[in-house]
Amino acid sequence: MLKRLLATTALAVSVLPLCAAPVSVEGFTHVKSLGGIDEYRLDANGLQILLMPDHSAPVVTFMVTYRVGSRNEVTGTTGATHLLEHLMFKGSPAFNRAKGNSIDQFLESIGAQYNATTWLDRTNYYAELGSEHLEGYVAIEADRMRNLWLHEDDRRPEMTVVRNEFEIGENNPQEALDKEIFAAAFQAHPYHHPTIGWRSDIEKVSIEKLREFYDTFYWPDNATATIIGDFDPAQALGLVKKYYGAYPKAPHPIPQVYTEEPEQTGPRRVMVQRAGELGYVGISYKSPAATHPDTPALNVLALILGDGKTSRFYRALTDKNLTTNASAQAGFFHDPSLFQIYAGLAPGARHEDVEKTILDEIERVKKDGVTDAEVAAAIAKNRASTAYARDGSFAIASVINECIAAGDWTLYLTYDEAVEKVTAADVKRVANHYLDHNKSTTGWFVPIVAPAATK
């Protein structure tokens, strides 16, 4: 999930390599170049390719982002995207453990760092490896796009792994509360469903359904291949053509999510009561998609309200000994999502006191606004955190991955240019527009103390 990983254009330009002219390779269309990144399309099937050479170290990251996440699931298949992500490592007729050339065996033998992740709007697969091994990884990654084995004998044990992850989340107070808040806030839109899925769907989804899901979304024209680091652009495009070029476009239109969440007309509340030690309060408000022009100002608002010990929430709550931590986060997703606030209760604190303190601080911002100094400090925080988050080819690819998922990879370069232009007036305006009590969902995590064992 993107957590303020985007940097300012000015900063990005300072750390990017000098831009070279895009290369011309038969079978590709050059789409555009921006900030040291060249975008191409593979003519045979519509695969999007992003190239960003950087020869500062002999390392390259290859990442494939599929535009499918939990927003593409329905009741009965929730968690399918994530379970399929696990099964993508089980091999194919060409690359498998019996042959000694599975993706795990290859990448571990060369010391690569690799993994895959699933989120609301996307699934990604990646490896950071020595430049000389790029072709070997591209070959395996391309192969599993269309030739994956999907066997029931693999589904059953992998399902138990995913179910264990589900149970770990259930035992985390903030994660458990967050799931309930999303489910209450989104009644129609599929952001209602947790990315890991509902337990019964995790346990019961069939291998046939997973195959159907794979055959629906895992196609070149629903994917982006991003290559960042030490490579030659013409040679890299040659590898993409060699290993992806034989695949056709999807034989059907990729299904699009068209469900829109109806306007919320009143506040909603949820309560989670289960074993635990400390309570939580969460308050979320409907917020726009990542590409909306108000999102940068909401990001600045979140930094002012809930980022660090100098933030308004932290100071207001700790002055009253009410909290151990407080945070605010502006949503950065493909569709309208949530502006989220969380506070962990200090021992002895009451939920209602924490909630009231948060709401009072929000009303203060809506009425009186914020200072120019607060805005400047928030922008500086955003700039600095981005610099730390873009350390290396994998870190950069990860940020671009979230921008692809949000609907536009160029947000990697343009988003923080907009953040730099946010004013105190902008922050006050978005606070009044979006932090609307009638569009809020409030949740309490109330720990239940287990009774003492009797002798």
Put a short name on every predicted segment.
Residues 2, 10, 43-44, 101-253, ...:
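Charge-rich, well-structured scaffold segments of protease-associated domains
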Residues 7-17:
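Bacterial N-terminal signal peptides
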Residues 25-66:
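Mature N-terminal segment immediately following signal peptide/propeptide cleavage
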Residues 33-36, 266, 426:
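Residues that act as N-cap/strand-start positions at coil-to-secondary-structure junctions
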Residues 38, 60-62, 79, 85, ...:
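Structural beta-strand/beta-sheet cores of well-ordered domains, especially the beta-sheet scaffolds
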Residues 55-104, 293-305, 312-315:
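Active/ligand-binding-proximal structured segments within catalytic/core domains
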Residues 167, 183, 252-310:
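His/Glu-based metal-binding/catalytic segments typifying zinc-dependent metallopeptidases
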